[in-house]
Amino acid sequence: MRNAQQYIESLRDGREVYIHGERVEDITQHPSLRKAIDHGALDYELDKRPELRDLLVTKSPRTGNEIRRYFEMPRSAEDLLRRQELIETTTRADASWVVFMKEIGTDALNALNMVCDDIDKKYGTEYASRVMKYWQYLEEHDLSMAGAVTDAKGDRRLRPSEQEMPYYYLKVVERRPDGVVVKGCKVHTTSSPITNELFVLPTRAMAESDRDYSIAFGIPVNTPGVKIISRPERGDLAEFDYPLSARHTTLEAMTIFEDVFVPNERIFMNGEWEFAGPLANCFATWHRFTGISYKYPFSQMMIGVSALVADYNGVPRASHIQDRITDLVIYAQCIKTFGRAAATQCIITDNGVAYPNPLLCNIGKYLFASGYHTSMKAVQEIAGGLPATGPTEADCKNPATKELIERYLGGRKGVDAISRLKVMKLVRDMGGTDGAGEWWVGTLHGEGSLQAQRMSISREYDVKKCVDYVKTLLEVK
């Protein structure tokens, strides 16, 4: 397995990355990108901690070598519970900011492993064996992965093949004996500027007319024609003022494919349009299981910072404070419970994969996304205005203002101004900074929008069974 430095060195590969209007020749030297890289590198450091090693590392069933547990194919509810614990634990170790180096990539691997079997059975293709060879390659080289799933979409009323601009959805523009050439753009691709490999999956169900848009593959990030435009990020934040986002961030980007060649051995769907929807839905379920798993530590942080603020302010037992904290506990435990239920009530597929319960994954993800803003409101209510108006670290060090801050911003007896400000800065960074803004939007739309979850819940739940129950009860037809 690689270490952090080997991961960082692997990013000096000539990839075409842009940020803040400039092409970055060496992303490891750019301050904004380097912050995300250092955050990602934690994935290659945590296994060195003795207390985490047994959880993070396992043996490959193919080679017997040590591998990251992310590459373990879940075969049972116990395996899924361990995957949940893995994501939860690594997120908590990284200040409740999920790493996203292998989570999304292995979500894609698990989805492809399930759906490609069905494609092969219908068409006699060899996609499943290609997926397993790629899986082994990623595992043996300990590579990081990004998932490029969401297309630019253009006019949402129209199918991919009906768009005025034909590349709003990634499209196969040429088929060759040795592979295909693709053109288009994927958006919101988390970590694509700083990972080794790109998984590309369809974002929606397709019609036969959308055959050229029904494509799935995996390629290196530095493949010629791949151009990445990162969202803006600051690399110069003071840790006192930004206790989370000074050191932790995940970068999202536009990932553009300008006539990119994909060899046959890396293609996992190529025109089998009727399987695009099942693959998109299968990936969404795996990814929402990941979402439930990484959101729980953040919800615990909400509880902890709220209780600490209340204590520092001298009102830990005030009834309205206790009401808000109880609401946060309910929110957190709903997330945890649906994650565990999705694992324990999993579906074992024909090829032996333990598939998280789709209905419960979608309900869990819907609850954490729809409740996030209300929960952060509770944190902000408890904290008051100081997270937004408090002085900076520079003010706390300035001889002209230091003593004044210490005199007036202390809390209850025994709580000094600096300790109180540190907690307030955490509240601010959770709910009122650029980094917090990413969380506000990302929690709603990451792993799919609220409407996407509603559609999945409606599809998965057997309403007819409930209707039949009422008919039987009333003895009506």
Residue ranges of model-derived segments:
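Acidic/polar, glycine-rich intrinsically disordered N-terminal extensions of enzymes
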Residues: 1-60
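Generic structural signal for well-ordered, non-transmembrane alpha-helical segments
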Residues: 34, 38, 136-139, 297-300, ...
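A structural signal for well-ordered alpha-helices, especially hydrophobic packing surfaces
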Residues: 41-44, 310, 332, 336-339, ...
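Glycine-rich flavin
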Residues: 58-197, 203-217, 222, 227
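FAD-binding core of flavoproteins
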Residues: 147, 152-293, 458-477
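Extended amphipathic alpha-helical segments enriched in small hydrophobics
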Residues: 290-349
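Short, charged, amphipathic alpha-helical segments
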Residues: 322-326, 354-362
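Alpha-helix capping/hinge segments and adjacent helical runs
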Residues: 359-477
